[in-house]
């Protein structure tokens, strides 16, 4: 709401206004050069100013030519009004779907036909077994060894935590163990057995 100004021979004034309770405010003098808060322009950094001042079209292109170029660049099979209401990412996704429709079915059919060709049927007709391992399902002994090493490391860490907890209880640093801490202490034997078994296997 803009403030009503009254001009007099002595300068500008904000007119006297009535408060909700019925009393009147005095007219107030406005200093020269004062700009009310509502009329102060909002701060814009240099990037905002740059993009506001940037033209929509490339230099030298007329608006008529730009409209023709936009019509020619439309995606086939999609109405113009549908494209106009979409965001950049939605438009990009639509283009990807179009590409997948053009390329996708052939590659899926090839994969399925290869899988069917490699299948062999047992004599009784009940069991179906693949002739060879499918891609990605090969057994890798190095990954199994790495997995065992990871398990051993985890168990050793848990045992170390149990030992530290036991030392704190013995020294009196922890006066009484909580339910979770007691469960942790109870699992120590099981963890040691599991560690021995893993070390024997490896």
From Swiss-Prot:
One of its GO terms (cellular component) is cytoplasm. Residues 89-102 have a biased composition (Basic residues). It is found in: Cytoplasm; Nucleus, Nucleolus; Nucleus, Nucleoplasm. One of its GO terms (molecular function) is ribosome binding. It comes from the Eukaryota. Keywords: Coiled coil, Cytoplasm, Nonsense-mediated mRNA decay, Nucleus, Translation regulation. GO terms for biological process: exon-exon junction complex disassembly; nuclear-transcribed mRNA catabolic process, nonsense-mediated decay; positive regulation of translation. InterPro entries: PYM1, WIBG_mago-bd, WIBG_N_sf. Interacts (via N-terminus) with magoh and rbm8a; the interaction is direct. Associates (eIF2A-like region) with the 40S ribosomal subunit and the 48S preinitiation complex. Key regulator of the exon junction complex (EJC), a multiprotein complex that associates immediately upstream of the exon-exon junction on mRNAs and serves as a positional landmark for the intron exon structure of genes and directs post-transcriptional processes in the cytoplasm such as mRNA export, nonsense-mediated mRNA decay (NMD) or translation. Acts as an EJC disassembly factor, allowing translation-dependent EJC removal and recycling by disrupting mature EJC from spliced mRNAs. PANTHER family: PARTNER OF Y14 AND MAGO, PYM PROTEIN. This is Partner of Y14 and mago A. The lineage of its organism: Eukaryota, Metazoa, Chordata, Craniata, Vertebrata.
């Amino acid at each position: 709401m803009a403030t009503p100004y009254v001009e007099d021979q002595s300068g500008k004034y904000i007119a006297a206004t009535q408060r909700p309770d019925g009393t009147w405010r005095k007219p107030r003098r406005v200093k020269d050069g004062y700009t009310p808060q509502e009329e102060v322009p909002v701060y814009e950094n240099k990037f905002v100013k740059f993009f506001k001042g940037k033209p929509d079209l490339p230099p030298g292109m007329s608006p008529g030519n730009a409209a023709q170029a936009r019509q020619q660049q439309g995606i086939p099979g999609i109405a113009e009004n549908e494209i106009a209401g979409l965001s950049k990412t939605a438009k990009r996704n639509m283009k990807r779907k179009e590409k997948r429709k053009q390329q996708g079915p052939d590659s899926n059919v090839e994969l399925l036909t290869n899988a069917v060709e490699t299948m062999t049927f047992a004599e009784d007709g009940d069991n179906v077994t693949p002739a060879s391992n499918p891609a990605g399902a090969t057994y890798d002994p190095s990954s199994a060894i790495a997995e065992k090493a990871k398990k051993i490391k985890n168990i050793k860490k848990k045992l170390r935590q149990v030992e530290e907890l036991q030392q704190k209880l013995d020294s009196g640093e922890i006066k009484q163990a909580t339910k979770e801490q007691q469960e942790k202490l109870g699992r120590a034997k099981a963890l040691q057995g599991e560690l021995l078994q893993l070390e024997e296997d490896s």
